[in-house]
From Swiss-Prot:
Record's bilayer topology term: Multi-pass membrane protein
UniProt protein name: Na(+)/H(+) antiporter NhaA
Keywords annotated in UniProt: Antiport, Cell inner membrane, Cell membrane, Ion transport, Membrane, Sodium, Sodium transport, Transmembrane, Transmembrane helix, Transport
Gene name as annotated: nhaA
Biological process terms in GO annotation: regulation of pH
Keyword Aminoacyl-tRNA synthetase: no
Catalytic activity: Na(+)(in) + 2 H(+)(out) = Na(+)(out) + 2 H(+)(in)
Location within or outside the cell: Cell inner membrane
Function: Na(+)/H(+) antiporter that extrudes sodium in exchange for external protons.
Pfam family, one: Na_H_antiport_1
GO cellular component labels: plasma membrane
Species of the source: Parabacteroides distasonis (strain ATCC 8503 / DSM 20701 / CIP 104284 / JCM 5825 / NCTC 11152)
Record-linked InterPro entries: Na/H_antiporter_dom_sf (IPR023171), NhaA (IPR004670)
Major localisation: membrane
Entry's family note: Belongs to the NhaA Na(+)/H(+) (TC 2.A.33) antiporter family.
């Protein structure tokens, strides 16, 4: 099965090597969805979203929830987005173990910044919408889309200090943790304890397996799929399963890099002293050479931790398939259904939460905390730089759309209308935040390349 997965992912990895801009692909999918939703093909578009997804073994349908087959929309949001959150979980674990969240001193400022970027947007949203059912969307402007935010920062090139990229990345990671907690606490349904208990047992087995150096990726793929199925049946949102599974994946390789280097020296010497049979038309290796090369391949594979190997394999799938597909099925705002009087309701609340709430929350919490003895401003960052980065934090998009789908029930007419309004707020808030953040940073950053870290 691991080979099958590699065969599926190999073309995507080759595509990713060319380094196409994943954010542009995401943006293109969004535009296509919006055009289709407001065109003569709108009915076809919505029929596609309702298309049933089946995967059956005998009488058991893997993609059924409470006896109902998943639609394309549900499959993307509940199944494929679990893979996205799995990769997010791997990145969070890496940051906690060895990255910007690995020590209290390094983590404090982005944690405080992220807290401001979650609390203040919710307050601004509730200033505009504070009655049911509109208030259900209060968590929508909490999210920061790290891919889009870093893409906008990347437009400024080498003028951006490395410390600024690190700060924004760490802030977004903490933001993701907050979003995951919110989804787990407030967007899960009635909990069925039997499948939940079984899923926790499977998670424990995955964790113990990792501790006992079971590094077979198939072990985590199969175990993870079982946990996802059980979470689906338990009533807890299945994307949470992706994060929890990620935390069980080992971050230590079987072979340390120093040992790999020593062993490689011996293997290369063995190859040097073995003749190659070759002609103009062919080159034939000896059994010894084949064995040595296979040993090198195995050794190299064991020198990369399962956490990094799995993340590396799944990143192309997430960036070039799952996220564009998510945007395509969720970004279809029907403008004709939006009445002028509703613009001051959910759309305004989400817009203000993202553009004003995120900016003020991140900037004020960060700046005030940096004035205390417990933290300082990152090297190369000024107040003006921080203000520009805070604006980029208002680019919500992916996770904001995801929370919007959880906040409002699109299967009812009233819920679909509110969801449509929320999507409009996400698009406008994210776009204005990105544009203003870019313009501010373009103005305040040094004109020459910076060397600070």
């Amino acid at each position: 099965m691991d080979r099958t997965i590699n065969v599926i992912l190999k073309p995507l990895r080759r595509f990713a090597i060319q380094k196409p801009n994943a954010s542009l692909l995401l943006f293109a999918a969004t535009i296509v969805a919006m055009v289709l939703a407001n065109s003569p093909w709108a009915d076809r578009y919505h029929q596609l979203l309702a298309f049933p997804i089946d995967l059956q073994a005998g009488q058991f349908n893997f993609f059924a929830h409470h006896g109902e087959t998943m639609s394309m929309l549900a499959f993307v949001n509940d199944a494929l987005m679990a893979v996205f959150f799995f990769v997010i979980g791997l990145e969070i674990k890496q940051e906690v173990l060895i990255g910007e969240l690995s020590s209290v001193r390094k983590a404090l400022l982005p944690i405080i910044a992220a807290c401001g970027g979650m609390i203040v947007p919710v307050l601004f949203y509730m200033l505009v919408c504070n009655t049911p059912p509109e208030v259900n969307g209060a968590a929508i402007p909490m999210a920061t889309d790290i891919a889009f935010a870093l893409a906008v920062l990347g437009l400024l090139g080498k003028r951006v200090p490395l410390s600024m990229r690190i700060f924004l990345t760490a802030l977004a990671v903490v933001d993701d943790i907050g979003g995951i907690i919110i989804i787990a606490l407030f967007y899960s349904g009635h909990i069925a304890f039997e499948p939940l208990l079984i899923s926790l047992i499977v998670l424990a087995l995955l964790y113990v397996g990792g501790k006992f150096r079971v590094h077979n990726r198939l072990f985590f793929y199969i175990g993870g799929f079982i946990v996802w199925l059980l979470f689906l049946e338990s009533g807890i949102h299945p994307t949470i399963a992706g994060v929890l599974i990620a935390f069980t994946v080992p971050a230590r390789p079987v072979v340390k890099l120093d040992d790999f280097t020593c062993d490689m020296t011996g293997y290369l010497n063995m190859l040097d002293y073995t003749e190659v049979r070759q002609s103009r038309k062919a080159e034939v290796l000896t059994p010894t050479q084949i064995q040595v090369l296979n040993n090198i391949h195995t050794l190299a594979d064991k020198t990369i931790s399962p956490l990094q190997t799995i993340a590396d394999k799944l990143h192309p799938l997430v960036n070039y398939v799952i996220l564009p597909l998510f945007a395509f099925v969720n970004a279809g705002v029907t403008f004709g259904d939006i009445q002028p009087q509703t613009l001051v309701n959910v759309p305004l609340a989400v817009f203000v939460g993202l553009f004003v709430g995120k900016t003020l929350g991140i900037f004020s919490f960060s700046y005030l905390f940096a004035c205390t003895p417990f933290a300082s401003m990152p090297t190369g960052m000024s107040k003006r730089n921080l203000f520009g980065v805070s604006m980029l934090g208002g680019i919500g998009f992916t996770v904001a759309l995801f929370i919007a789908n959880l906040s409002f029930d699109g299967s009812t007419a009233a819920g679909a209308d509110l969801l449509n309004q929320a999507k409009l707020g996400v698009f406008t808030g994210s776009f204005i935040s990105g544009l203003c953040g870019y313009l501010v940073l373009k103005w305040v950053l040094p004109k020459e390349k910076v060397e600070t870290i």
